[in-house]
Amino acid sequence: MSRFPAVAGRAPRRQEEGERPVELQEERPSAVRIADREEKGCTSQEGGTTPTFPIQKQRKKLIQAVRDNSFLIVTGNTGSGKTTQLPKYLYEAGFSQHGMIGVTQPRKVAAISVAQRVAEEMKCTLGSKVGYQVRFDDCSSKETAIKYMTDGCLLKHILGDPNLNKFSVIILDEAHERTLTTDILFGLLKKLFQDKSPNRKEHLKVVVMSATMELAKLSAFFGNCPIFDIPGRLYPVREKFCNLIGPRDRENTAYIQAIVKVTMDIHLNEMAGDILVFLTGQFEIEKSCELLFQMAESVDYDYDVQDTTLDGLLILPCYGSMTTDQQRRIFLPPPPGIRKCVISTNISATSLTIDGIRYVVDGGFVKQLNHNPRLGLDILEVVPISKSEALQRSGRAGRTASGKCFRIYSKDFWNQCMPDHVIPEIKRTSLTSVVLTLKCLAIHDVIRFPYLDPPNERLILEALKQLYQCDAIDRSGHVTRLGLSMVEFPLPPHLTCAVIRAASLDCEDLLLPIAAMLSVENVFIRPVDPEYQKEAEQKHRELAAKAGGFNDFATLAVIFEQCKSSGAPASWCQKHWIHWRCLFSAFRVEAQLRELIRKLKQQSDFPRETFEGPKHEVLRRCLCAGYFKNVARRSVGRTFCTMDGRGSPVHIHPSSALHEQETKLEWIIFHEVLVTTKVYARIVCPIRYEWVRDLLPKLHELNAHDLSSVARREMRDDARRKWTNKENVKQLKDGISKEVLKKMQRRNDDKSISDARARFLERKQQRIQDHSDTLKETG
């Protein structure tokens, strides 16, 4: 488990021999030193005072601009104060008298941390005047006037309040990230004003905030609304291309050693100032923390470091699945003489602002969800960042003083491999969940919905087909009663379908823990240290064996139940190398799902079924009801082929309990695929063909165009055009035939025949005369 945060320096607490690092361990040098500093009266940005921001000079103009316009775009550099200060200004100007001020964030970490910050500045308890709502966690009340939330939570709110009557202002923050949900919110808000609904509040205002984006395009989308620019206060940032990655290394992400070396060089050779390092995910971050700590431990601060005021390096990881307390540590100032180094995902590029950063190390890559048309699935891939994202990252080094950005890639990599802007998520991921939401909002024409960037029609049709396969829509593309129930669940439609099937069999207790575990991040800790890695793998194998050793879904259920019943869940997780924070989240998810199922089963028309058979078979049958699209059959050796019509080859992931048991299997279902050197199926269980025999035809029985009312209308129009053209041709042919007939009739009467004979004889007589004249001339 991670030992970080930790300080490597002159006098850190060394790990005892044989001691294993403990997750969430509080007795660490960094935490103790920071706490001591707070007790001595040193304050930080988190301490309840409002720092100065460039936005403060624009306060009056900005408030007036919001009053004067239904839509307003606010732009400014990251750190200008848009996220924390504008909602406060609007609250103090009285906007909350007509409803809440809602502020969306793409990530739950940002929604929570910003709400905490604003509550401290306004000197109120979090959940009172200032609150937040993220998936599975609603910290708000009737008193709440400023509500930070994920964009997904606002989309769910619109299902019950389509006209947003509870809000006076909607602020869509971080619009430049172009998440799928934010793009759908763009369209819904535009449609709300276009339709001129009589129930819409007159006072509703929409503010779109972005650090970097195609602003003219966004303004045109919202009816050429004004753009309010907040002048920035960024200091100059010098950029250096380290040339460690070139265009040929586009697929190569094995750059951890290089990044650690660059980071260590900064610590040794640059003057005071904190460091921010960008990597793609938790595994890379924890590995980098370990390597950097090992290097920093060997530094002699009397001779090796150029800045003699430095005594150590405080190493702090930052990624989405960390607890709130762990995330808060990155905002605290380091102890005197200690340089802070935050190693983070892309979340620190825009969503979080960390004071004191003067050096940025840009790894050049990000994890991105992309739709793989060959597999028909969304794949989480590591891809090069865009140029706009790279500029966002470098800007973090120039907030409080001049800084430096070290890009590990080359200038050629920048020019050849990095797109100018982020590719909108709506153009590269599955649209199944949002299409269902639009259908439930009575928006049936999902193809002609007002998208800022229209997605590929193929993605829309594929989403419709998947919803039909889950019985969420009927053959006409209209949402079913089941679809209306499914949209309430914070799960993907196929997993919701499996849960509802289990509820109809009165065995939801078997599936709810699994659904909850699949809703959180990977629960298994896989340490970098080889010794701990072996111990963790052994513990994970033991857990799989308790589930029968042949079903990864069942293993998740065993982990859930054993941890919950242990009496000391955090200690149980520590012993078994399981992320306690993920299990804690799963417990909350399971409770919410159980309440939704309870309400669903109270409906008089809820279907009831019976099944006589062992529990493990019932569980797998219910999984088949939702995952039959992810069915694969063994073909050759250890390779399986999907049965969705593509026949894509997949392999069982090495982390699965079924790995190296492939020859014993015939049919499997899987939760997701990962693409590395091969296409791997992850979280797998064996099934029987007869369980999916009646379900598989649904993958092929209907053309996706049949589910789209637009496609049907266009096909009808096309058919009408073809019929009209056919009739015109027929009429033309008929007209030609009548004309020909008249000519034939005219030619065949007696007068026509005698006239034709006379003309023939006349021409013959003329030829004879001409021939006679020629002979006379030659003679």
Curated annotation (Swiss-Prot):
It comes from the Eukaryota. It comes from Rattus norvegicus. It holds the Pfam family OB_NTP_bind. Residues 1-53 are annotated as: Disordered. GO terms for biological process: mRNA splicing, via spliceosome. A motif (DEAH box) lies at residues 173-176. GO terms for molecular function: 3'-5' RNA helicase activity; ATP binding; ATP hydrolysis activity; RNA binding. ATP binds at residues 76-83. Belongs to the DEAD box helicase family. DEAH subfamily. Its EC number is 3.6.4.13. The lineage of its organism: Eukaryota, Metazoa, Chordata, Craniata, Vertebrata. Probable ATP-dependent RNA helicase. SUPFAM superfamilies: P-loop containing nucleoside triphosphate hydrolases. InterPro entries: DEAD-box_helicase_OB_fold (IPR011709), DEAD/DEAH_box_helicase_dom (IPR011545), DNA/RNA_helicase_DEAH_CS (IPR002464), HA2_WH (IPR048333), Helicase-assoc_dom (IPR007502), Helicase_ATP-bd (IPR014001), Helicase_C-like (IPR001650), P-loop_NTPase (IPR027417). Residues 13-41 have a biased composition (Basic and acidic residues). It catalyses: ATP + H2O = ADP + phosphate + H(+). It is an enzyme of class 3 (hydrolase). Residues 263-442 form the Helicase C-terminal domain. GO terms for cellular component: spliceosomal complex. Residues 63-231 form the Helicase ATP-binding domain. Keywords: ATP-binding, Helicase, Hydrolase, Nucleotide-binding. Residues 42-53 have a biased composition (Polar residues). This is Probable ATP-dependent RNA helicase DHX40. Transmembrane segments: none annotated. The keyword ATP-binding applies.
